[in-house]
């Protein structure tokens, strides 16, 4: 019984915390994202998705150890970039 009461209090506290810390005017945030995406459709050069990091290694080049991330353009390294 005590455990059930503690769980109910914890859920109510977390729900209240979420409501209190929620970002105000979230509709403006979505509207700004829509406007930014619309601008990128009209001007593809403005899109950050089209940019490529030239510091990465092309496929086949030695990258070192097994890791996922930066040295290879694909993001996969198993002694040579995939």
From Swiss-Prot:
Q: What is its main location?
A: secreted
Keyword field contains Secreted: yes
- Descriptive protein name: Omega-conotoxin PnVIB
Q: What protein family is recorded? A: Belongs to the conotoxin O1 superfamily.
Question: So which residues are the signal peptide here?
Answer: 1-22
Record-linked InterPro entries: Conotoxin (IPR004214), Conotoxin_omega-typ_CS (IPR012321)
**Propeptide residue intervals:** 23-52
- Give its localization: Secreted
Kindly list the cysteine pairs connected by disulfide bridges. 56-73, 63-77, 72-81
Free-text note on domains in this protein's UniProt record: The presence of a 'disulfide through disulfide knot' structurally defines this protein as a knottin.
Q: In which tissues is it expressed?
A: Expressed by the venom duct.
Q: Which UniProt keywords apply?
A: Calcium channel impairing toxin, Disulfide bond, Ion channel impairing toxin, Knottin, Neurotoxin, Presynaptic neurotoxin, Secreted, Signal, Toxin, Voltage-gated calcium channel impairing toxin
Organism for this UniProt entry: Conus pennaceus (Feathered cone)
Molecular function via GO: calcium channel regulator activity; ion channel inhibitor activity; toxin activity
Per the record, its GO cellular-component terms are: extracellular region; host cell presynaptic membrane
Tell me any Pfam family this protein matches.
Conotoxin
Q: Please explain the role this protein plays, according to its UniProt record.
A: Omega-conotoxins act at presynaptic membranes, they bind and block voltage-gated calcium channels (Cav). Acts on high voltage-activated (HVA) calcium currents in molluscan neurons.
Record keyword Disulfide bond present: yes
């Amino acid at each position: 019984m005590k455990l059930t009461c503690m769980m109910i209090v914890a859920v109510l506290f977390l729900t209240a915390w979420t409501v209190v810390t929620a970002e105000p005017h979230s509709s403006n945030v979505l509207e700004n994202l829509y406007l930014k995406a619309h601008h990128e459709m009209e001007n593809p050069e403005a899109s950050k998705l089209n940019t490529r990091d030239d510091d990465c290694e092309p496929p086949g080049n030695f990258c070192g150890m097994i890791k996922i991330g930066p040295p290879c353009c694909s993001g996969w390294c198993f002694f040579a970039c995939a």
